[in-house]
Amino acid sequence: MKNIQILFQTLNIFPKNLVLYKQALTHSSYSNEQTPPQEDNERLEFLGDAIVGLLMADYLYSQSKEDEGIMTKKRAQAVCEKSLTIYAQKIELQNYLLLGKGEKNKDFNAKGIMADTFEALFGAIYLDLGYLTAKKVFHNIVLPHLAKTIYIIDFKTQLQEIVQSEKKTIQYKIVQEQGPAHSKNFVAEVYLEKNLLGTGEGSTKKSAEQKAAQQALSKVAKTKDLIKNKGVKEKEL
């Protein structure tokens, strides 16, 4: 096990309660081998799971105007076990982990141990140094690798990029709204000038627009021809 002070230097933090960090780095397999048993990281993992999810939700909400569905999918991918393991490896968290003899020779990445430890670490940082410090550390670790862990397709952005490459603009129009206030259904259409590119339905206006953009992209060759003014039947607004 490396000197934990090196980890603190990597994270650029100045801890007040070292006991919390030792606990965060103590796997239950190690704890059970001690006499008396030491407190393991499972409770901090529980707290850290919520903190990590909140930090990612906070970031996604502040950085975009995407609808709830897209942000939910992005958050799920960004803080899934595989992604958390990647973040843990980037700070070499495995070098500080206290593992029992039976676990040391196993692939603890595959078992989710590193992901759990990453969450426990953020539980410790939150309790010791507060939300703002946890947020700063989280951003420093996660944001450089976010593009590799999020694979959500934003159809509106894709369509917009195609249109902008031809120096054109598109317009979304909500053409239908049905249902009670608690269970609305919307129909959206996306136009290039007077040409209908796609139609979509959704429980929110933004999700309907995403579906409309997706339909336009599914006919990408025809859409590109339209954008380049090669002649496609028009529908009047």
UniProtKB/Swiss-Prot annotation:
Gene field: rnc
Cited CDD domains: DSRM_RNAse_III_family, RIBOc
Domain of life: Bacteria
Family: Belongs to the ribonuclease III family.
Cofactor list: Mg(2+)
Annotated active site: 49, 119
Keywords, comma-separated and alphabetical: Cytoplasm, Endonuclease, Hydrolase, Magnesium, Metal-binding, mRNA processing, Nuclease, RNA-binding, rRNA processing, rRNA-binding, tRNA processing
Gene Ontology molecular function, alphabetical: double-stranded RNA binding; metal ion binding; ribonuclease III activity; rRNA binding
Domain DRBM: 154-222
Localisation: Cytoplasm
Protein name: Ribonuclease 3
Domain RNase III stretches: 4-130
PROSITE patterns reported for this sequence: DS_RBD, RNASE_3_1, RNASE_3_2
EC numbers, comma separated: 3.1.26.3
UniProt key word Cell inner membrane: no
Record-linked SMART domains: DSRM, RIBOc
Main function: Digests double-stranded RNA. Involved in the processing of primary rRNA transcript to yield the immediate precursors to the large and small rRNAs (23S and 16S). Processes some mRNAs, and tRNAs when they are encoded in the rRNA operon. Processes pre-crRNA and tracrRNA of type II CRISPR loci if present in the organism.
InterPro entries with a match to the protein in the record: dsRBD_dom, RNase_III, RNase_III_dom, RNase_III_sf
Any single GO BP term: mRNA processing
GO cellular component term, pick one: cytoplasm
Protein species of origin: Aster yellows witches'-broom phytoplasma (strain AYWB)
Disulphide connectivity of cysteines: none
